[in-house]
Amino acid sequence: SDIKVPVVTVDSICQNHNLTPPFLIKLDTHGFEVPIFEGATETLKNTNFIVVETYNFDIADKSLRFYQICQYLEEKGFRCVDICEPLFRKRDDALWQFDLFFIRDNHPTFSCDSWS
């Protein structure tokens, strides 16, 4: 049986609930990240930190793999700063999913490109 749920945007939630920035966005949406970000254009302008569960495989139609999420968010002014919780597929130990952490591309972390 199909279950119908209302779809609302992140921007409308923030506006309707008078939420004040700065924002942190955490997504664990199994391939639905782009439509969510598309509904968060204003919220993203006031977001400093994003955590996204990403995949190394195409898990859904139009889903983005981890490197594509990095490219997509870089276009929005964010860069990946950390990774955690890698999960490996049981049948062949292939890297399946992990969380990526993003901060603003103008954060002081990125002012130095050297190791030391």
Ranges and model annotations:
Residues 1-8, 12, 17:
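Glycine-rich adenosyl-binding loop in Rossmann-like folds that engage adenosine-containing cofactors
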Residues 13-116:
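Conserved acidic-Pro-Pro-aromatic motif
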